[in-house]
A protein has these predicted regions:
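Trp- and S/T/G-rich repeat-edge/linker motifs of beta-rich repeat architectures
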Residues: 57, 61-74
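Feature primarily recognizes SF3-like P-loop helicase cores of small DNA viruses
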Residues: 2-4, 8-50, 76-452
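Short polybasic amphipathic segments
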Residues: 52-59, 115
């Protein structure tokens, strides 16, 4: 973005007091010739427009930046309706340089000073049109980011640092192949947000900061993530998400998706944004207890803050000074992730943490694993009513809030294959009666007096 504005300033076309001739895009009546102006602009600064968004060799150009450049050019000549003329010129410019799409290149990283080819471990100083150019330079001689590594050692358990390294590297290229989002969880005050500052230094405007809740609820929010490498929620809300479909789709999407911008026709676009969140608790769903919701998450638990630690108020700035070295560190994580076929390094600590999170959000998981209430046995069967009765009894005796009967039965149907049980809507209950139930499960407690 800064490079675009610097270039446009260097090519400023507004007439000065010393100039006598009007530029070629001013017609004989003194009006701006929109076609001629756009041709001039594209000749001095080549651009492409995809889905109403402008890009140059350095990546995305915001409408605000383009508007400022146009105003600087035409303000000497347009004395009425300046804002409308700027809007018309921007619209015309987008039409003239419109293309269907640019290739999504996940085999290379567009650094500020050139192109790095991942598979070849090769850098060239040449630039090409791209959707994502990082503001940080590729410098193989950059010093080791010692402050950053010390910060991570104080923040995370040693075995979890490779996970963060791989995920941060994952955000350097436009792909969702790993199909994961990362949550960094703590009690507050540990310094998690400094990770976001470092990522901003490396990714620049290729990173958006917004909330996961907004992404899930606001139908325009997914379109805001088009062309972005990372969406960061630096203060996750603890309230459970009522709908997780959009979130799950964004994390895993590998094809086009319907996107909508306010006041615009919806369109089919590609998203490759990754999601990272910082919070005091895990991401929870109000209704979604599917394996898919939890399978897409990695949750890293930070260390407790050392009560004797003296916070360095300038640490964020010091970490940013190491951006080139941190970029190499991220690149190392990306190479490892690719070698492992986009499977993240997950410590036993994090695996247990994720299992605990899932069980705490869905107490049916703990009920399945409980002893003395139910037993999985292919020779047995039980009605859904009796299974739910055993579940309610387990909740009462473990101070858990039972799910509603309908919610329980729906989830049990979804879990049946994993549990190795078979649904039967006409289970023989004796005395000529039939009821819904399952083969392969035995209820071990008396539910008659506790549940009707």
């Amino acid at each position: 973005m800064e490079r675009f504005e610097e270039t446009m300033a260097a090519f400023g076309q507004g007439k000065t007091d010393e100039e006598e001739e009007d530029p070629i895009w001013i017609d004989s009546d003194g009006n701006v010739d929109e076609a001629a102006y756009c041709e001039m602009l594209l000749s001095r600064h080549p651009m492409k427009c995809i889905h109403n968004q402008l890009y140059d060799v350095d990546g995305h150009i915001t409408d605000a930046s383009m508007n400022r450049a146009i105003i600087d050019d035409i303000k000497v000549y347009v004395h009425k309706g300046l804002a409308k003329k700027v809007t018309n010129l921007l619209d015309a410019l987008k039409i003239m340089c419109s293309v269907n799409e640019m290739p999504i290149q996940d085999d290379r990283i567009h650094f500020q000073n050139g192109t790095y080819f991942i598979d070849e471990d090769r850098f060239i100083p040449d630039k090409e049109f791209c959707i994502n150019r990082l503001p940080v330079a590729y410098n193989p001689e950059a010093p080791k980011p010692v402050r950053w590594l010390k910060f991570l050692d104080e923040l995370l358990y040693e075995e979890d640092i490779p996970t963060l390294q791989e995920f941060m590297g994952y955000t350097m290229i436009p792909t969702t192949r790993a199909q994961k989002m990362l949550m960094v969880i703590g009690n507050g005050g540990e310094g998690k947000s400094r990770i976001g500052r470092v990522l901003r230094a490396v990714l620049g405007d290729n990173m958006n900061t917004t909330s996961i809740e907004k992404l899930a609820k606001d139908r325009f929010c997914p379109a805001d993530q088009e062309g972005k490498l990372l969406m960061l929620d630096d203060d996750m809300k603890m309230s459970a998400l009522p709908d997780t479909n959009v979130l799950k789709a964004v994390v895993t999407i590998e094809d086009k998706i319907d996107l909508e911008r306010k006041g615009k026709q919806s369109f089919q676009g590609r998203l490759f944004v990754r999601i990272m969140g910082f919070g005091n608790g895990s991401l929870a769903a109000l209704y979604d207890r599917s394996d898919g919701f939890y399978r897409r998450q990695i949750a890293l638990q930070v260390k407790n803050k050392d009560q004797d630690r003296i916070d360095d108020t300038k640490l964020g700035d010091k970490l940013i000074e190491e951006a080139e070295g941190i970029a190499l560190w991220m690149l190392e994580g990306l190479h490892r992730l690719i070698r492992n076929d986009y499977k993240f390094t997950i410590s036993s600590r994090t695996a247990r943490n994720m299992d605990d999170i899932r069980k705490s959000d869905n107490n049916m998981m703990e009920f399945y694993e409980s002893e003395g209430y139910i037993r999985f046995d292919k020779s047995c069967h039980a009605t859904t009513k009796r299974i739910y009765g055993a579940y309610v009894q387990w909740c009462q005796e473990n101070v858990e809030k039972p799910l509603a009967e309908k919610t329980f039965t729906q989830q049990l149907r979804k879990d049946a294959e994993i549990l190795g049980i078979t649904y039967d809507k006409n289970l023989d209950t004796g005395g000529g009666k039939k009821a819904r139930g399952y083969h392969g499960i035995n209820v071990m407690v008396n539910t008659e007096n506790r549940f009707l």
